[in-house]
């Protein structure tokens, strides 16, 4: 089970596009939900004063959102459902932004109604769906599986709109629909539940042609239980629900097209149009006068007309786009507002407060209802500009005072920690990503802004549209090469270390929209080739070694959507937007075939090496673990603009078989349009970060001996007796250890091929070091070249982003002093990725969306007011005994700092695991907890929770216990129960971090008991029971446990780093039989500083 990834969004000055296609207000009247053409959902906070503020973006769809609806009884579970054009359906928890369920069906829904009859059906209810398919689908609201369907006995057709009628008079529920042909159909709901559950066919009981087309809305009047409002695009009608006889018809005037309507009171109708106007009508004389049908077939004449009382309109805007998406809400709670709301393609939301008794003017003319509130995403960014700065805003000085560089393309190189940004003016900026993030986020950023070396490459005369780092795709290519393309169809090959232009390719085509590389098995002249897709639908193939253009295919009539390779015959297969296929012979440059229709589909399906618009290939060479973001992106093969493009992660394609390894820190550039990058996401992999800081990675050790060390201890004793272990006197037993040396992970040797090139940067230059051979005993392993200082800096930045700065100023000072972490400049936009396809990001100004936080914690990095309550509960559950971690009371500052950081991250890792697990899994560890049983269940579904619990218990007391202590079990249950309370992962992590940091500082005697937030004063007497006991160290040897499959470092001096180095220069390694190294203390009688693995595996060898 994969843990969630923590994210920090570095927005630019411009908000991402959000073209609203669907809108609704939740039943609690606190949240507005909008779906967009770009595929994402936005949650907007709605206050009791009808003030709007954007709060969160939810990513889960890869196509335009078509409709939104309630998915549960909202008072019990705050769930909604969204549907997209490509058949995707997602169930969301709007409280925490989590996607609860997702499915893709071969149906395009245009309307969804939730139905649940508590006394007649079990489960969570049904989603009744209609759209571009016949009749009505019934989908299970929990699993999103198709249950059954309502069928038509005559004239089955697509359904335009529908509504559920709950009649209190006859105690029966009915489903009313109107087809595209204008036929009204009625199905019984209540009496059909058993038939549906038994998979029996259910047909309509009534039907009637309404003699109008393009039905937009059908609504039942709950006030009279007699009126039925049906809105068509050119007229709206009122029918008698008893016999469906026509009572009233109102035809559109001034060329307006109606878009919907609602019955807001008895005999009072609200109608709105596609251009954002609305009208309130009063049906005079009760409005119920039978229509006259002339015998000669002339136009229907009504005896009376409805009286127009009020109207609303939107502000005139030259850039105003249609159609508007509108809706109506009648609040059932105080203050009992009646609200008309609308969403625009421009992303604007507008609210009107409808009076309880609308009246016209004294002269009888309609009264204009003013706009109550209006808001856009850009308003959030303008109001909270400190939170909406991009990752390279501090480079604005490079532009000679002309403002911040406008980023149009971006690429992150994890192996170098380099962020490459192509700008609108043609320049390319290269900087250290982690340092750039620090300068953007932290208060001490002024100290960092001058330190990170940056480079500016100048060679383009137009905007840079695409970037490619070939070495990230194939390790056999030169590490210094980088490709960039611009609007003027110029592709430049750079040496990023020397800043030289190696070659320029002038394609004489349209803008270079994508740079791709051929797969590993497809080589021409012994080398892989580069594919350039241009805006004029042409494709060019470049040979980097020969610095030549091999092919320029120009005959495509439609935008290129797919590139495939045929390695046997050297064919390039191009798929276009019209589903046609072009087959090019690369050597001769001739067009071999052009196919369309079924033949084209067969050809595309026969090729394996595809480069698709929506593939699920990895985003970056070191982010295989970041699957949640990878699969959400539209992949690197984004060949030109899509009709409904979503936000896409920009990166290089990964089509090689190179060995990759995960990274604790990653930067993902995210596109908002095909021509520019809107913002960047910082991704923190907490699990990988803990793996690197703890010398024994959690996921790669034998579970039977990894935490309690029984088998390792026996092996160590046996090996000592045989005198096959290497002993080394510790020269630092009583001396201080640096934080970097303490956190230095066990590293894997570089094993790409037969050799590797190590390099480090000094003063903006590159030092090429000699190649070194690797022992033939070593098995090829993924390159795991990790800079220890970079890892500890990543950990500090991660803690800085999550700490609730400002809640307790004394605690802030102590964290800066004793943990050596910097304070945030202000609240940041946090995010999270919980599963493979969905993630969420907070928007600038999210901290002011909770009314309870505005007064007390304005400008505080507190995720929600709930964090303080959760922190109280966590502190109260902690054991009452107080213990100082071994060695912390007399350790040097750097060692104590590093110990504390690793301890905090380990705790947060545990919380991150538990909060996403069901309660029954977490409680299962309470009965019996022996390591043998874990070994037998290594491949079981509950392995993660058992592993984490053993880790938790070992960190707590360092003893081999057969079961989890009651106090620990209480903590496990508490954290697991938060899931059922709609607690977000970020809330849980921040609450635990606040409690742990505060308790840790108190246990060290650094702060008094009463120096804490007011909300935590009740639990001030609850001290933290420290994890690590004091052990006897009379004749102690430090045992360092490493992976069974990894080579081990020989005793060498600690890794030395340059100030600007990107990777540690690790020494040669040798394979040892037991893969363990024992170090003897220089002063056996004295306690000495031990690495964290000695605390995780407390082994004492006599």
From Swiss-Prot:
A Pfam family hit: WD40
Give the source species: Homo sapiens
Q: Which GO terms describe its cellular component?
A: cytoplasm; cytoplasmic vesicle
The protein depicted here goes by the name WD repeat-containing protein 72
Residues with the Phosphoserine modification: 1081, 1083
Q: What is its main location?
A: cytoplasm
Compartments, as annotated in UniProt: Cytoplasmic vesicle
Q: Which UniProt keywords apply?
A: Amelogenesis imperfecta, Biomineralization, Cytoplasmic vesicle, Phosphoprotein, Repeat, WD repeat
Write down the InterPro entries for this protein, in alphabetical order. WD40/YVTN_repeat-like_dom_sf (IPR015943), WD40_repeat_CS (IPR019775), WD40_repeat_dom_sf (IPR036322), WD40_rpt (IPR001680), WDR7/72 (IPR049916)
Instruction: Note the SUPFAM superfamilies from the entry.
Output: WD40 repeat-like
What function is annotated for this protein?
A: Plays a major role in formation of tooth enamel. Specifically required during the maturation phase of amelogenesis for normal formation of the enamel matrix and clearance of enamel proteins. May be involved in localization of the calcium transporter SLC24A4 to the ameloblast cell membrane.
GO annotation terms (biological process): biomineral tissue development; protein localization to plasma membrane
